[in-house]
Amino acid sequence: MYRSMKSLALLGLLGPTSQVFAHPATGHAHNIGRRGVDIEAFRLPQVGSYTNATEIETTPPIALLKRESYVETATELVKKLAPNSEFRLVGDHYVGTNGIGHVNFKQTVHGLDIDNGDFNVNIGKDGKVFSYGNNFFKGEAPEASPLKKRDFKDPVSALKGAKDVLQLPVEAASASAEPKEGTEVYSIKGTSGTVSDPEARLVYFVKADGSLALSWRVETDITENWLLTYVDAETGTDVHGVVDYVSDLANYRVYPWGVNDPTEGDRVLVTDPWDISASPLTWQSDGTTNYTTTRGNNGIAQSNPSGGTAYLNNYRPTSAARNFDYQYTTSLTTPSSYIDASIAQLYYTANHYHDLLYTLGFTESAGNFQINNNGKGGVGNDFVVLFAQDGSGTNNANFLTPPDGSNGRMRMYLWTMSTPRRDCSFEAGVVIHEYTHGLSTRLTGGPANSNCLNALESGGMGEGWGDFFATAIRLKPTDTRATDYSMGAWVYNNPAGIRSVLYSTSMTTTPNTYSTINGVSSVHRIGETWATTLYEVLWNLIDKHGKNDGPRPEFDSNGVPTDGKYLTLKLVLDGMALQPCSPNFIQARDAILDADKALTGGDNLCELWTAFAKRGLGSNAVYSSSNRRDGFNVPAGVC
């Protein structure tokens, strides 16, 4: 079966054209920003800790803990470390391809979730505790259940409070609340302006000052933003935090895998490009239907000139022979004339990336995006909806990541920085960056929790992971550690790209260290430092293990990638699943180090520590939300 390219876009919304050349945009919820509300002010507080594998080894009561199953071991650990806390097991535990079991817990009070009270436990191959992250509330819980007196605002009032504070385009004058299954969960009927009925759930929320607030978690999908708004249940007007499932990106164009954009190569016709181990149903079937259009188990791609959320009846190319071979040149001036090529490119790139991530460990049980999970765990029914030439914006792209079981949604826009305009579906780096938001959001904190990358430093790493994966995948056979890369250069029509730095191992070209992010409020600027650090890791491991320039990794008998490039991607991906909810740089660093211990027995700790230390994340680095301190030390005995 034949098919041409398909691709997705990346990067965050950049803002007005007059500002784009100076800096990328600073936040995710830019449609809210256009209404005058800065959603950045409502990011979730960064709390919690991560206890790494080395620390576990020096704590015998924990290191020796073992029960009959990995879930029971994890549960026993939480009981020991939080003996006075109520909690529940989140039903998204799984064993990763590296043999590490991941178990997530949610703290509760009087039967209500503390929605940002998370505890993740990682269990090693030996059945013992490997590492853990703890975001549990440690203060005094309220003595009386709020459900007895019920002196709190109703869910409709909370929706109206969220609407007023965030200036949401929602009409709720005639709204009413209908109970759903669960404790104090309601569907709010009679609204307009949302994709689906808003939902309100009574929860507790740990505020930035460490206190606990009874809150309504109001969920609203308003097309460009899918928000969880924590509204104080006592006042109905105070907003304690906002999570946006949508992650913003930039637009890129794609050719065959490894060709980042039209400046790097020509379009070619590829045949059956899927990895059958990652997509056993191929890209053209979901196990029930064999499709002759750009639809399959991993995604569905179509045009979306209206910018809406409907997709099933949108236009997509059809070929009975599955020969998605359409004309495109960069000189074409009317985007609609090459929409078939754009959709095919987007579909190809997204599916190819799905397959690569699958081989690296982003599988069904880990929360990947598939309709049919083939009985391999996870929830399923959540392929990625891919919108080409989306009409809801320009000069950007975005990705929405709800929890496992709900569709991811990618919007690729046209870019107006050149004549003719450029379609970001043809820049693979944009697609990869965007899709990586789905990867990092699903893995961090578990597939059922999409709230764990909302804190400022965590959100910055979300942007950095996207840039890093896109950059690593585009490496060329002749590249060395002296090779520098920009992001989004083609769609932006500027060799410097959309970021303020080049990704480089040169401290002269890009001098960023951990302390560089002090005082920075832009997740994209924070992400530049994280991606730069990972670029150092990449080249240290390539220099040690070589570089596989093929489209897929090769593994040794222990499941370890045999080259430095794919080994780095594997360790970074595994680290996402190990790290706690709302991680900071140091915790994410520790999780990557732990990932190497789990996968290779720590064979690469010298190279990893050396890379981190070069960028200020050595063993003596210190996290503080306002005064991060660089550390350039490598632990004694590591090298």
Curated annotation (Swiss-Prot):
Could you tell me what induces this protein? Expression is controlled by the prtT transcription factor.
Question: Highest taxon of the source?
Answer: Eukaryota
* Propeptide residue span(s): 23-248
Q: Which residues form the signal peptide?
A: 1-22
Q: Which residues are glycosylated?
A: N52, N290
Catalytic residue list = E434
Q: Would I find 4Fe-4S among this entry's keywords?
A: no
Q: Which protein are we looking at?
A: Extracellular metalloproteinase mep
Native species? Colletotrichum graminicola (strain M1.001 / M2 / FGSC 10212)
